């Protein structure tokens, strides 16, 4: 592979002119890099890998595209590799030309492409032969010259000619190891996409191993052929043998890469660490090490490794990109933005950085800025499915349905090939298109006159919520876009009346109080505004209810119920991000309800730790221990003391498995523990909470998860509890309106928190339950005269606080400890009605789109 800025040369052999593709293959770098099977082991695939992306699929995709081809090239990317590994050249004493036809990296390209004639090839071959700078050189000068010619042919891209040359030599000397080896390389270079080439390459390399079993470079070369074919375990075995014969930094790095592909991040980390101990100046190995941390959820350790890689190579684009993504996962928007920007300053056309930055901006609520990144991404890569999907989503979220649906249709037309797995974007896009059409048709219909949960077909909702392929029998598509319904236009903040501007600023502030300060949760200003407006609308609706006013829902006027209160927040959460199906699970088809919906969260999967929930691992561990002791107290009282002593030594969830297997033969490969939720309505009665599952055969290969199964029967029990609490809340709220007694306000506060405690444990929505419920808490408390002034503490998740609390009183106590409740400002009473100010979908999208930052900052 040639350094960036290197020119490439044509060559003649036997009167035949190499094709234009061969003309771009550089003799020097191919002999240094591609012939590394014997000249510098490992370069064929190891040095040809692009740096590992943050997503394993990206790594595998690139490996499949690049490694099988094996050809050199003068791309800037391959140049990066040559530069990154310059520190490793001392690992091998193999061929190192100095009389190259290439300019050094960074200089201008050659003025013209030179042709290598027969004389020059022979001259190069003679030089190689004299110094025996090729694999398995012999003691015969004439034989060495013939072998060197064949290797130069490989370097010139003339693989068939090289194979014929080696074959002629093998007819005379069947066990000539260098010829067998070279022919294997040539077959591999022809392209592993042709399985025949792969089989012949492996056959030849296996012959070499039989004849020369103690040469590590041959095992590595065979691993380089095996890995692109998906035969990872065999490749790892070959690299292990090579390491046993002659350890090197490159070999450990190469094997670590394969462990990474296999998702064995801990073992991959060990190999990258070993590689760095042998040669510390390896920015790519340091990047890989950081990625093993990243994929295990160890974000701070990953960031340190990425920074170290940048110390070694200041212009390392992939390290900046990875650093940006790690900061994004931590929720540090400013640091992530800075890192992505540095990557793009080095290469403004770096597609994956544009894609990742665009997605971060979308989830930060900066849709216009996100859209610019996706458009630029598509200019560079027109068939980039992620950027195309996100472009369509961004347009739809801003109310630009024509452009949005056009982009969605492009994704829909990109059908996967037979046997190819459909991308997540392809699976989601038809749901988004149908939902987009529905939203467009209702842009100007009063929100009180229609209901998404009723209008959308049951099977559509069921499949969408479960992220299933769009295979719905007898589905009738939503009507196409109606020309008379125009897209949403941009609304300047200054165009709103002063009192509406004040309403928006208050909403922004309230919404920011709902932000989780936990890894994995990026601040989203669009969600903040939406849920702040939801809280204010809940406040106003609850106050009207407590003064005996009725509400208009679905075209009917009636007294507000608890679901109406939550529906206010649901509508705002839905429109803030139309990508996510926020649907009531009890409104699903009867068949789906009977089976139940599982709200599943992996806390540990294999070696991957979900950092969002790390704060709760110890709490869940203590709960599991208590349940185990209760179980053994009832079923194995004699062995209870032994079990207790064993459990006292357990400090990590994953260490529970061997203990359970030791004391319970029924455990086999896992066990489950169920939580219970005590009833307030019926003292002594308990409802099913969530299920904790731990499965696996050893530490490092476990699944630690929690799930809530929302069945029809369970839903009815929780609804009865919430109905009773809401009835009590309404009665006490009406008393509170007429009274200023502190005790009444405190009782109302406890009822609000208790009601939401059961909502959290029920998990009645397909998405968004957490922020929806918290906005209801904030809004209902304001209706009672109390304002939430405190932020949610770092590491705390309100839904998990409710789910892991022993009862509603405990949840109320912990929630009030951080809410810092104070008397509501009188100015809230003068705010305009949210439902009347934003009565349609169009007006809701307009207010979410508008930029209030300069004015609202002044008001605060």
Curated annotation (Swiss-Prot):
Q: Where are the TPR repeats?
A: 143-176, 216-248, 249-282, 284-316, 317-350, 352-384, 386-418
Repeat as a keyword of this entry, yes or no, is yes
Arranged from A to Z, the UniProt key words for this protein are: Repeat, TPR repeat
Annotated InterPro entries: TPR-like_helical_dom_sf (IPR011990), TPR_rpt (IPR019734)
Query: Which Pfam families has this protein been placed in?
Result: TPR_1 (PF00515), TPR_16 (PF13432), TPR_8 (PF13181)
What name does the UniProt record give this protein?
Tetratricopeptide repeat protein 13
């Amino acid at each position: 592979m040639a350094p960036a800025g290197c020119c490439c040369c044509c060559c003649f052999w036997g009167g035949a002119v190499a094709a234009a593709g061969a003309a771009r293959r550089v003799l020097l770098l191919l002999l240094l890099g591609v012939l590394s099977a014997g000249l510098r082991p490992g370069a064929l695939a190891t040095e040809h890998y692009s740096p590992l992306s943050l997503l394993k699929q990206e790594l595998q995709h690139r490996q499949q595209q690049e490694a099988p081809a094996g050809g050199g090239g003068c791309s800037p990317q391959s140049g990066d590799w040559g530069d990154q590994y310059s520190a490793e050249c001392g690992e091998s004493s193999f061929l190192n030309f100095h009389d190259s036809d290439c300019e050094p990296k960074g200089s201008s390209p050659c003025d013209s492409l030179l042709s290598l004639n027969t004389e020059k090839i022979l001259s190069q071959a003679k030089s190689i032969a004299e110094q025996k700078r090729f694999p398995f050189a012999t003691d015969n000068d004439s034989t060495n010259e013939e072998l060197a010619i064949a290797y130069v042919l490989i370097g010139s891209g003339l693989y068939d000619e090289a194979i014929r040359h080696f074959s002629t030599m093998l007819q005379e000397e069947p066990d000539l190891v260098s010829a067998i080896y070279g022919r294997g390389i040539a077959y591999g270079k022809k392209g592993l996409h042709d399985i025949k080439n792969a089989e012949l390459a492996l056959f030849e390399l296996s012959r070499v191993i039989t004849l020369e079993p103690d040469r590590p470079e041959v095992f590595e070369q065979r691993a380089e052929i095996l890995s692109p074919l998906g035969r990872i375990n065999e490749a790892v075995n070959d690299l292990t043998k090579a390491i046993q014969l002659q350890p090197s930094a490159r070999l450990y790095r190469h094997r670590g890469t394969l462990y990474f592909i296999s998702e064995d991040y801990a073992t991959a980390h060990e190999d990258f660490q070993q590689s760095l101990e042998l040669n510390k100046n390896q920015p790519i190995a340091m990047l890989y090490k950081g990625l093993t941390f990243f994929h295990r959820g160890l974000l701070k350790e990953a960031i340190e490794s990425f920074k170290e890689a940048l110390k070694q190579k200041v212009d390392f684009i992939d390290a900046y990109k990875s650093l940006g993504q790690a900061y994004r996962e931590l929720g540090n928007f400013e640091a992530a933005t800075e890192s992505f920007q540095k990557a793009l300053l080095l290469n403004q056309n770096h597609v994956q950085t544009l894609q990742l930055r665009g997605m971060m901006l979308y989830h930060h609520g900066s849709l216009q800025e996100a859209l610019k990144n996706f458009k630029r991404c598509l200019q560079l890569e027109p068939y980039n499915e992620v950027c195309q999907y996100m472009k369509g989503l961004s347009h739809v979220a801003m109310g630009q349905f024509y452009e949005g649906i056009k982009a969605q249709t492009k994704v829909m037309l990109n059908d996967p090939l037979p046997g190819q797995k459909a991308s997540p974007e392809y699976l989601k896009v038809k749901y988004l298109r149908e939902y987009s059409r529905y939203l467009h048709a209702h842009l100007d219909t009063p929100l009180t006159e229609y209901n998404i949960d009723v209008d959308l077909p049951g099977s559509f909702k069921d499949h969408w919520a479960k992220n299933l392929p769009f295979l719905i029998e007898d589905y009738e598509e939503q009507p196409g876009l109606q020309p008379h319904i125009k897209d949403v236009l941009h609304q300047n903040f200054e165009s709103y009346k002063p009192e509406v501007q004040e309403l928006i600023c208050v909403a922004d502030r309230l919404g920011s109080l709902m932000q989780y300060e936990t890894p994995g949760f990026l601040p989203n200003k669009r969600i903040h505004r939406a849920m702040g407006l939801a809280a204010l609308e809940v406040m106003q609706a609850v106050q009207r209810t407590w003064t005996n006013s009725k509400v208009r829902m679905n075209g009917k006027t009636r007294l507000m119920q608890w679901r109406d209160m939550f529906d206010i927040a649901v509508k705002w959460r839905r429109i803030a991000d139309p990508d996510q199906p926020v649907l009531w699970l009890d409104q699903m088809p009867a068949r789906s309800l009977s089976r139940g919906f599982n709200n599943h969260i992996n806390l540990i999967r294999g070696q991957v730790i979900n950092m969002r929930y790390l704060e709760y691992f110890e709490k869940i561990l203590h709960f599991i221990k208590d349940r185990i002791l209760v179980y053994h107290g009832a079923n194995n009282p004699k062995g209870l003391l032994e079990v207790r002593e064993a459990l006292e030594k357990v400090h990590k969830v994953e260490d529970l498995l061997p203990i359970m297997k030791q004391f319970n033969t029924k455990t086999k490969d896992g066990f489950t523990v169920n939580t219970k939720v005590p009833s307030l309505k019926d003292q002594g009665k308990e409802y099913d909470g969530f299920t904790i599952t731990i499965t696996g055969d050893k530490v490092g290969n476990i699944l630690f998860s929690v799930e809530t199964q929302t069945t029809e029967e369970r839903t009815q029990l929780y609804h009865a509890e919430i109905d009773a609490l809401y009835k009590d809340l309404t009665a006490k709220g009406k008393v509170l309106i007429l009274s200023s007694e502190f005790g009444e306000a405190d009782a109302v506060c406890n009822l609000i928190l208790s009601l939401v405690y059961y909502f959290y444990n029920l998990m009645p929505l397909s998405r968004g339950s957490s922020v929806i419920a918290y906005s209801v808490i904030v809004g209902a408390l304001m209706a009672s005269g109390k304002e939430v002034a405190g932020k949610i503490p770092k590491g705390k998740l309100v839904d998990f606080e409710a789910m892991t609390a022993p009862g509603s009183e405990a949840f109320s106590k912990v929630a009030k400890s951080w809410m810092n409740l104070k008397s509501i400002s009188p100015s809230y009473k003068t705010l305009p009605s949210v439902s009347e100010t934003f009565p349609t979908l169009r007006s809701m999208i307009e207010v979410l789109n508008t930029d209030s930052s300069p004015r609202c900052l002044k008001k605060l």
